Amino acid sequence: MDSGWARGRFGVARVARLATVDDLGRPHLVPIVFAVDGSVIHSAVDAKPKSSRALRRLANISENPQVSLLVDYYDEDWTQLWWARADGRARVDDDGRTAISALARRYPQYREAPPDGPFIAITVERWSGWSAADG
């Protein structure tokens, strides 16, 4: 798949899986909501219940900024299956003005209760994907 197709799948997906790696090489995978803004994908630590605000994903990004995001579509009709991935470098950002704006355009919940962060900004270095329809 070309990068434009993969990037387009991120425009229709509502949730992604963020993959980070800790300093010992152990993977960590969590679902996130996100917004694409050019070549940057934004996400936020928001008010949804969490055991702590000191999240493993934030520590992992500080230790190793290389991350992957995966979106996918499943259907019982396997000719409809697809997945798309964005690989890039993430950074934790406390000033989330750009992220809040992008996320609020995509998710009505953030218009009512904007996240207070911290925020994650991922500069995408590679878009890739697969679709059963295209083999």
Give each language-model segment a name:
Residues 55:
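Structured soluble/peripheral alpha/beta segments that form catalytic or ligand/cofactor-binding pockets
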